[in-house]
Amino acid sequence: MQSNFNLSPSPSTTEPFLWGVATSGYQIEGGYNGEGEPKNNWFLSEQRGSVMKTGAAAEFWTRYEEDFQACQKMGLTAFRLGLEWARIQPSTEISLSAPPAFDLDALDGYTDRIAACRRHGLEPVITLHHFTHPAWLGLDAWLTEDTIDRFGEYVQTTVAHINRRLIDHHQLAPIHWYITLNEPNILVSNTYLSGQFPTDSMLGIGSVFPAYNHLLAAHVRAYNLIHDLYESEGWATPRVSLNTYCSDLYWSEKVIWDLLSLRLRSVDPA
């Protein structure tokens, strides 16, 4: 639906610097993997006691206004808000013959939280996938090409619904910033190399490249879907990316020589 107000980008040729915080829906919202609650791929790990149960988590789903107020007081200008696929396309079962319906109330709930984010002067940066997926996809969802299609359907439905509600219900412009996948390199390595994330695969390193390929294909699919939607609706061009984890390993390679040289340089190691 076309809006009646100006959705054009700022005439400025440079993007503003954003200073903010980042969240994951599963890690902060609460309300997952309990009785009668949506299940994601950590459900079995929680039941087996290999990780703590989610429980109420940080209660973001009910106390988001307090978090936004705290961010505003700290002078932040952005809030990276993670959407939980398992809430948006939920099932209390861990095995299904077909994907379940999308929960429009959940999508409306996320829209309301994004609108509240903006009311507090925070630019929303929306993460569409942060390590977790619905349990009905199986533990090793990213080893199958079908997950690319399922992810595309999720992205298309979610982005279209939330933005149209932002425009029609809240009289706000569409979302400008998206992260399709949070740290896909860590998702793969923690699942198939270090074993920190749940998996049923016995292939180990043999699962790494198939999972990478499917995740990158899913990113491209999401990128194109979002841009195509915005173009067809006449919305301002969005910024869509993924973020990867990188680390400076100086400490593991050089720090010992720094410590050994302290005495030579008359520096107190304390």
Model-inferred region functions:
Residues G55-E65, P99-D112, E145-A160:
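Glycine-rich anion/phosphate-binding loops
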Residues Q2-L44, R48, E93, A115-A270:
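Active-site region of glycoside hydrolase catalytic domains
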Residues S45-A56, A86-A98, L139:
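Glycine-/proline-rich flexible loop or hinge segments
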Residues E66-T132, I226:
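Aromatic-lined substrate-binding rim segments of carbohydrate-active enzymes
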Residues P9-P11, G34, K53-A56, T77, ...:
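Alpha-helical protein-protein interaction elements
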Residues P16-L18, W61, A78:
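A common structural microfeature
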Residues P38-M74:
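Aromatic- and Gly/Pro-rich amphipathic surface segment
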